Amino acid sequence: MEESWEAAPGGQAGAELPMEPVGSLVPTLEQPQVPAKVRQPEGPESSPSPAGAVEKAAGAGLEPSSKKKPPSPRPGSPRVPPLSLGYGVCPEPPSPGPALVKLPRNGEAPGAEPAPSAWAPMELQVDVRVKPVGAAGGSSTPSPRPSTRFLKVPVPESPAFSRHADPAHQLLLRAPSQGGTWGRRSPLAAARTESGCDAEGRASPAEGSAGSPGSPTCCRCKELGLEKEDAALLPRAGLDGDEKLPRAVTLTGLPMYVKSLYWALAFMAVLLAVSGVVIVVLASRAGARCQQCPPGWVLSEEHCYYFSAEAQAWEASQAFCSAYHATLPLLSHTQDFLGRYPVSRHSWVGAWRGPQGWHWIDEAPLPPQLLPEDGEDNLDINCGALEEGTLVAANCSTPRPWVCAKGTQ
């Protein structure tokens, strides 16, 4: 009180100053809901005030929450703090004591450690005092008590502290107040919070605490993973039919497209059947061609030849060839096999002499240049034979080897 009197202008020690009523300074039992006031320093030369320490200690014990708490029990006789030293006095920081112990929150056990990954922004209440400017500087009248306005300022997350930097600096999550701007979130962020992830896609503290406490617990949201998986599977499954169907469906319609598809399948089936029949026929012909000549016969171009190892008369040789639907060699046969295979010097051919002269077995006459020699005078020599590649007249009863010739089947 003496210091406040000495600070009055004019240096009058006995002057009486109007003092504020004590009831306005003493916190009553009916005002526990008013947030704590934090006085701003204005002068470095002022001495610390015990009243400011009491107010700061009381403010530190209150939780910055939007919910109202019941008044704390107080003794029967309230303690009257000393009079205020005036506006602009810097309060001294209070000493550590029972009043600075942090009270447990609702639903939290005393002494529980904060959960990991729980650093979240909070709201500060700033005490703004407006001082009128109309008061004279040299007046002895004390300035009126400034009006007080409380503003809620949203404080974002500090960039100096990471969410997972140090568990010692992590705070508990608090529910945002109704008037705060931090509580206004988008529906997407609210959905992520309900599903167990925060706005950045990390796991909530309840889920993250299940992992190792030393490592950062960060996971992808299940909803985001399912959405990405569905987005990857939809084009593969062809569920977006309007984009994946062929252009023919858009132009002709689905019924016509299905009908044309049926016709295409039927045409392909018929084509496969015809191809199979053609392959079977060609294979059968190839097998028959390989067996055109009987066993023991030789294939030469389009004729089959049989070279006998025995000797018989001309008539017996012709009878053997007729049994295999063949004949003794004719002119066309002779020119073919004589050029390819060696023929015995003395083998029968299919030429003989009748009443009309020399002719082949098929009744074709012999050309004049092929007529046998020395056959005109001897009437018993009426059968043709080969000797050294030349057609000669021989006795029909003389045994000779023979050659049978026939066309391919």
Swiss-Prot record:
Protein keywords: Disulfide bond, Lectin, Membrane, Phosphoprotein, Transmembrane, Transmembrane helix
Biased composition (Pro residues): 72-81
Keyword Repeat: no
Gene Ontology cellular component annotations, sorted alphabetically: membrane
Membrane topology according to the record: Single-pass membrane protein
Chief site of localization: membrane
Cellular localisation: Membrane
Compositionally biased residues, Low complexity: 41-53, 104-120, 202-216
Superkingdom of origin: Eukaryota
Residue ranges of every copy of the C-type lectin domain listed in the record: 300-405
CDD domains per UniProt: CLECT_NK_receptors_like (cd03593)
Modified residues (Phosphoserine): 158
Transmembrane intervals: 263-283
Disulphides: 321-404, 383-396
Residue span of region Disordered: 1-120, 193-216
Molecular function GO labels: carbohydrate binding
Ranges in coiled-coil conformation: none
Listed PANTHER family: KILLER CELL LECTIN-LIKE RECEPTOR SUBFAMILY G MEMBER 2 (PTHR47606:SF1)
Protein name (database record): Killer cell lectin-like receptor subfamily G member 2
GN (gene name): KLRG2
